[in-house]
């Protein structure tokens, strides 16, 4: 992270990235007078934005062997996401780096490790590399991992650490919204207000729209959720969270969800909703065969 002593030249770039304005992050990345450390962080953010947009091959081809270690880690994430059939070798390379005392403690490498192992649903392994924190990105990832482990008590402790560092930080606000959604009940309204605040301060993104829509669904406002999700779909027709949320929302408003599910199958075959749907189909087929 940039030193608090001087101006934070990457503040706007980070904010674009955190809120899902990935193209804006890329378009506004030419920033003058950056230190060498800031240049590496800037390049990592830009390439992570390309990864978020699904441009894996661009990242793989642009980052060569001479690039800084954090950028090599970002390239590894692109390789992991681009070819699931080769993920074992990618994870093996990652483990080698993590075991190397000269680079293994680098914040970006630990962030990428946490992200990959979270994808693998190996949450304990993810936490092994992220739990010590050190950056707001790592603390926020810890919150996500604990929520996936259904340990909102640990997630709350991480959130308190973030609040002590910077209560107004975009990642602190996002982590608070994620936790409120996980806890549910009266906390849903608090999560909605966070996303509403984002939508008033910043250009609307799929991430903000999905956040508001999920809150609406939790509160039973499925028509409003559908409107928000269709707006998100107009911004990015392949966004997996938008498609997954539209599948759920369509079922609640009595509309067919098959088109959205088929789009999700084509663009993100590894998505948890696609796997659950396939499992349900298999179980249904087996049930039918038992009656045949």
UniProtKB/Swiss-Prot annotation:
Listed GO MF terms: structural molecule activity
Biological classification of the source: Eukaryota, Viridiplantae, Streptophyta, Embryophyta, Tracheophyta
One record GO biological process: protein transport
Assigned protein family: Belongs to the COPE family.
UniProt superkingdom: Eukaryota
A GO CC annotation given for this chain: plant-type vacuole
InterPro entries: Coatomer_esu, TPR-like_helical_dom_sf
Localization of this protein: Cytoplasm; Golgi apparatus membrane; Cytoplasmic vesicle, COPI-coated vesicle membrane
Membrane protein topology class: Peripheral membrane protein
Keywords: Cytoplasm, Cytoplasmic vesicle, ER-Golgi transport, Golgi apparatus, Membrane, Protein transport, Transport
Subunit text: Oligomeric complex that consists of at least the alpha, beta, beta', gamma, delta, epsilon and zeta subunits.
Described function: The coatomer is a cytosolic protein complex that binds to dilysine motifs and reversibly associates with Golgi non-clathrin-coated vesicles, which further mediate biosynthetic protein transport from the ER, via the Golgi up to the trans Golgi network. The coatomer complex is required for budding from Golgi membranes, and is essential for the retrograde Golgi-to-ER transport of dilysine-tagged proteins.
Name this protein carries in UniProt: Coatomer subunit epsilon-1
4Fe-4S recorded as keyword: no
Protein's UniProt keywords contain Cytoplasm: yes
Database matches in Gene3D superfamilies: Tetratricopeptide repeat domain (1.25.40.10)
Pfam families in UniProt: Coatomer_E
Primary localization class, coarse: cytoplasm
PANTHER family for this protein: COATOMER SUBUNIT EPSILON (PTHR10805), COATOMER SUBUNIT EPSILON-1 (PTHR10805:SF3)
């Amino acid at each position: 992270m940039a030193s608090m002593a001087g101006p934070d030249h990457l503040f706007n770039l980070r904010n674009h990235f955190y809120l899902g304005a990935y193209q804006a992050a890329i378009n506004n990345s030419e920033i003058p007078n950056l230190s060498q450390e800031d240049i590496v962080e800037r390049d990592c953010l830009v390439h992570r934005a390309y990864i978020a947009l699904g441009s894996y091959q661009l990242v793989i081809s642009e980052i060569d062997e001479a690039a800084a270690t954090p950028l090599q880690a970002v390239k590894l994430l692109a390789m992991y996401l681009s070819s699931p059939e080769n993920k074992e070798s990618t994870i093996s390379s990652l483990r080698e780096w993590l075991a190397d005392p000269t680079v293994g403690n680098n914040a970006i490498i630990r962030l990428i490790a946490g992200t990959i192992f979270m994808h693998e649903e190996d949450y304990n392994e993810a936490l092994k590399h992220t739990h010590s924190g050190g950056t707001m990105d790592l603390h926020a990832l810890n919150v996500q991992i604990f929520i996936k482990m259904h340990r909102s008590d640990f997630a709350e402790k991480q959130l308190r650490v973030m609040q002590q560092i910077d209560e107004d930080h975009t990642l602190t606000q996002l982590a608070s919204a994620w936790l409120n959604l996980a806890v549910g009940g009266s906390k849903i309204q608090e999560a909605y207000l966070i996303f509403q605040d984002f939508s008033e301060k910043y250009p609307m993104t799929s991430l903000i729209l999905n956040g508001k829509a999920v809150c609406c669904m939790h509160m039973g406002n499925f028509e409003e959720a559908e409107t928000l999700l269709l707006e998100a779909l107009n911004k990015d027709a392949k966004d997996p969270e938008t498609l997954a949320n539209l599948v759920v929302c369509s079922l609640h408003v009595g509309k067919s969800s098959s088109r959205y599910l088929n789009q999700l199958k084509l663009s993100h075959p590894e998505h948890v909703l696609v796997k659950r749907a396939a499992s349900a189909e298999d179980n249904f087929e087996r049930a039918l065969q038992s009656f045949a």
